[in-house]
């Protein structure tokens, strides 16, 4: 049988092969949004077995296993690591058509030199081989990053985080990869969360002030933003179920915050007013510091109440939202632009039905001397498969200038997920190669190769000012 993963994987014509192998393949990786643990990088975590490395916290895999009816004990429960790996291996063949199938075999091939298909027959051979390698030098958290040619990553961090692990990494001259924090203040934006007031109290503690009113909350946020800035942070990230926008004055925001603090229920309008004012305050602060603002919009979180109570958040029970989007997004960006305080912004939509809304909106807010100031963020989460990536690139190209795109990110908690950059690069090269093949683009490898390199590396390097 011909190897499943070979040099031509996903490259369906000679033009795609030239673009990938001559222009994209060897570029370093800038992974500007991920969920890796800075502590695990600082400590250069070693993994006892493949279940620790591969299945711990990977809700993509968990969802696939549940879809096949696998008992929860083999997913997040009491089964042994070997039993959990076996359950995943039995699942893999049935993931055909899902990116998990490609990612699984790319990861085995690139990091463990495993060329066989993972399934019920091969699981023990793969388990033993990979676990043996994990005990050797060169198979730690940092080693996987180095082997992947990673240059720079952005983690996702709560405002309460002391960032000590990031500082340890920065001070370690033996490790050249830059690991920088991103400011993720969702717990402050979501004023109707049951835990909101408790979180605000903790925020005040780390910001060295008592948060008794809305003005003090804004000061606490500013204190933490500046703390993050001193630790090397240059990005913020916001996860929003929908895009809020409702005009709000400072006095109104103060009243709404006080109402929540006194235990009264807030209306949807009050919630949106608070969110709008607070997001605008933060965005202006980001602008003043030269940060990039990321908006991840459109996920419904923790939809299965029974399983949320059993397992908590980020365990595979989230999905795509639908909502009123175009007007609030444009109003929010316009408000900041009108005041001359719109930071570089990346807008991600989880719902691909809104691709054209985002792709057209970003063109409304250009800036002289800045290439692609407002970006249509990479195909995300339920869209980071071949069809989703192609749809995103085509939609961006159709109504914008896709050569300005800042490229792929892993959005992952796994140290093996850097193969997603290879996956993305192959898809980009195959897409452009198909345009050449169909006569829709010239066979100008030097020019198109430069566009490939920009999308895969250089645009991000420039956008995040990494030079």
UniProtKB/Swiss-Prot annotation:
GO terms for biological process: D-galacturonate catabolic process; D-glucuronate catabolic process. Coiled coil: none annotated. InterPro entries: Metal_Hydrolase, Uronate_isomerase. PANTHER family: URONATE ISOMERASE. Belongs to the metallo-dependent hydrolases superfamily. Uronate isomerase family. It comes from Geobacillus thermodenitrificans (strain NG80-2). It is an enzyme of class 5 (isomerase). The keyword Mitochondrion does not apply. It catalyses: D-glucuronate = D-fructuronate; aldehydo-D-galacturonate = keto-D-tagaturonate. This is Uronate isomerase. Pfam families: UxaC. One of its GO terms (molecular function) is glucuronate isomerase activity. Pathway: Carbohydrate metabolism; pentose and glucuronate interconversion. Keywords: Isomerase. Its EC number is 5.3.1.12.
């Amino acid at each position: 049988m011909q190897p499943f993963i070979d040099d031509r994987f996903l490259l369906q014509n000679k033009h795609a092969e030239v673009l990938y192998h001559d222009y994209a393949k060897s570029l370093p990786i800038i992974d500007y949004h991920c969920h890796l643990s800075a502590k695990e990088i600082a400590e250069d975590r070693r993994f006892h077995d493949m279940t620790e490395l591969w299945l711990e916290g990977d809700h993509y895999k968990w969802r696939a296993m549940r879809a096949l009816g696998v008992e929860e004990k083999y997913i997040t429960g009491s089964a042994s690591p070997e039993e959990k790996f076996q359950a995943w291996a039995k699942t893999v063949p049935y993931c055909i058509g899902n990116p998990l199938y490609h990612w699984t075999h790319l990861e085995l091939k690139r990091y463990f030199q495993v060329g066989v298909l993972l399934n019920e027959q091969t699981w023990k051979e793969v388990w033993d081989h990979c676990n043996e390698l994990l005990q050797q030098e060169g198979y730690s958290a940092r080693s996987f990053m180095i082997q992947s040619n990673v240059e720079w990553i952005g983690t996702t961090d709560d405002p309460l985080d002391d960032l000590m692990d990031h500082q340890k990494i920065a001070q370690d001259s033996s490790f050249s990869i830059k690991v920088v924090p991103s400011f993720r203040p969702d717990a402050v934006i979501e004023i109707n969360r049951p835990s909101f007031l408790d979180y605000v109290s903790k925020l005040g503690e780390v910001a060295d002030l008592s948060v008794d009113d809305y003005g003090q909350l804004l000061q606490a946020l500013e204190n933490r933003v500046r703390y993050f800035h001193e630790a090397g942070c240059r990005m913020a990230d916001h996860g929003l179920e929908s895009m809020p926008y409702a005009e709000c004055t400072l006095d109104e925001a103060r009243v709404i915050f006080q109402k929540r603090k006194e235990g009264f229920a807030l209306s949807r309008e009050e919630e949106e007013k608070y969110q709008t004012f607070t997001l605008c305050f933060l965005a202006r602060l980001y602008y003043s510091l030269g940060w990039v603002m990321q908006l991840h919009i459109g996920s419904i979180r923790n939809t299965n109440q029974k399983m949320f109570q059993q397992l908590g958040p980020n365990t595979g029970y989230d999905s795509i939202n639908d909502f009123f989007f175009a007007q609030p997004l444009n109003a929010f960006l316009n408000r900041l632009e009108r005041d001359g305080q719109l930071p570089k912004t990346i807008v991600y939509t989880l719902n691909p039905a809104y691709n054209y809304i985002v792709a057209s909106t970003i063109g409304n807010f250009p800036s002289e001397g800045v290439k692609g100031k407002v970006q249509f963020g990479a195909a995300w989460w339920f869209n980071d498969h071949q069809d989703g990536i192609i749809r995103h690139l085509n939609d961006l190209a159709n109504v914008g200038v896709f050569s300005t795109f800042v490229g792929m990110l892993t959005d992952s908690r796994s140290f093996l997920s850097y193969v997603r950059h290879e996956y993305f690069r192959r898809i980009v090269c195959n897409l452009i190669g198909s345009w050449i093949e169909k006569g829709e683009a010239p066979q100008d490898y030097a020019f198109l190769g430069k566009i490939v390199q920009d999308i895969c590396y250089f645009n991000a390097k420039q956008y995040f000012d990494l030079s």
